[in-house]
Amino acid sequence: MTARDGTRFLTVSTPYRQVTEVPEYWMEDILAEDRVLDIGANIGAFCIRAAKISRHVSAVEPVTADLLEANIALNGVEVRVIRAALGDGSPSEIEWDNVRSLVPTFRLRDLIRTAGGCDFLKCDCEGAEWQIEPGDLAGIRRIEMELHQPPIGGLPNEELLRSIGEQYTFSIDRIPVHGPLGQMGILHAWLQSPD
């Protein structure tokens, strides 16, 4: 399958959703020198497009990593794949559309270290975003993050939200979701210049 922008994806039958378009994430200001970290990469819709701009892209994916790697190769871009999930550092059972996997998890600071740094963070990790510690965002210039409310994940991390509010200029696009997924939003955040 070829998307409108020319990005190609393998189409195979899987028990989970394969995301090929991500218009909800704003990526127009990714810079060539940015170190981009895509947490929750699925099959590559964001990281493949980011890798057409920056040569320093890492993708974290716990469930769909095989198809992600195949799509990266199909598009002829370089993306480092980290087969893990954002979490507290303990192995965790991750579920995506009824596919369960026991995977290693890492705190954001450890994923950033493994990736060689992070200037632009995209995070779509089904509620695990609330495990991010505010200090782990140090030095990140841009954030694109899906925010979940229960029943996905846990209660919002007020300390994280307060820290983002103090350090970043931001907006949140609310996404109406009905049914068991609760309510979601997409955070778009830009690090403020020090005065």
Question: Predicted segment positions?
Answer:
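Phosphate/nucleotide-binding beta-alpha loop and adjacent structural elements of enzyme active sites
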Residues: M1-D195
